[in-house]
Amino acid sequence: MKKFLSKKPVKVIIGIICVWAAVVIVCNAVFASIALELQKGVAVCDEWSAADTYTPDYAQSVEAGDEDFKILCLTDIHIRNHATFGASWLGTNFILDTMSRIKLKQLINEAQPDLIIVGGDSVLTAWNDICTQQFADFMDGFEIPWAPVFGNHDYEGRADKAKLAEIYENAEYSLFKCGPEGMNGMGNYIVNITRNGKPVYSLFLMDDGQFRIVDGKVTDGGVNENMIEWYKWAVDGIAETTGNPVPNMAFMHVPVPEYKEVNGEYESGHRGEDSYTAVENEGFFQVFKENNGTHLFAGHDHLNNFISEYDGVKLCYMTKSSYNCNFDFNTLGGTLLTLDKNNNVNTEILEF
């Protein structure tokens, strides 16, 4: 055997690679054939009208007590990543997924957050329901409340968004709710951070990643008018039921157009690419600013993780959290928010 290997090492290596590639291609072909069967969900969104009365139980809540409250933001994990030939057919996605899981587990265990927010594009695969279930099981394993939003790629597979919403709603530690009908997508919901049962900060989780047609072209959806109306209704309702205005943050996948205006003045992080936003600006930033909004968080642009103040609002990118799909080693990890005892928000980028 040693003699054989010493004489023909290159042929042996090539043979091993060919066998491995053949096995991977066959396995992927089998999975692909299974993935052709469409999976439709039955997740039901709530009927909603701006004339409805807001009640405190409308929102999810997480109690902070009298301690600092830590929120870890992850985004664009892209499990399975079928976007490239190498990732899909040569099996590199499995290696990158495994590496990412190891680093994510380490990151979460070291940060010890009280809440985890996932900013969309968690999966990118034909069998998106299977991978979404695997991701939900992975997140539940930490026994920490977590709140996901959809990106523009999660539902690009055999399962529709309703099926994925079912999976998220049924996950044990997930706070996900399908939310109101008539919005852009599914998964518009609220998580109130409370102290002694009283909201001190509201987190708006918004699905702005649903594609739509603008001037005959497919583009990122953005925050539409119905979502803005719902946001204002909820902010007013929370203030009325709490007895005072409550500051809020919003988390979405696609950045609002104002991110394009940020150039060079960063509190932390950096810009590695342009901001790819919705084509149409429906005015959410201005409404957010006028309604006690303090921080906007987005994903989508993998090479950006900056935090910057723009017109009185912190525009923040969540840090890309995996080795799968386009990435830069300088912008991998997570973004940690700490709500101190006085309810001030401090941000920190945690690197892999």
State where each predicted segment sits.
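N-terminal Sec-pathway targeting helices
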Residues: 1-24
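Extended active-site neighborhood of metal-dependent phosphoesterases/phosphodiesterases
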Residues: 39-63, 133-243, 335-338
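Active-site environment of divalent metal-dependent phosphoester hydrolases
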Residues: 80-83, 124-127, 148-160, 211-214, ...
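His/acidic metal-ligating clusters that form di-metal
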Residues: 111-114, 202-205, 217-305
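Active-site-proximal beta-strand elements of phosphoester/diester hydrolases
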Residues: 69-84, 200-210, 251, 313-320
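Binuclear metal-dependent phosphoesterase catalytic core
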Residues: 27-61, 190-196, 284-287, 291, ...
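N-terminal active-site segment of His-dependent metallophosphoesterases
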Residues: 32-134
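Divalent metal-coordination and catalytic microenvironments
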Residues: 76, 104, 116, 121, ...
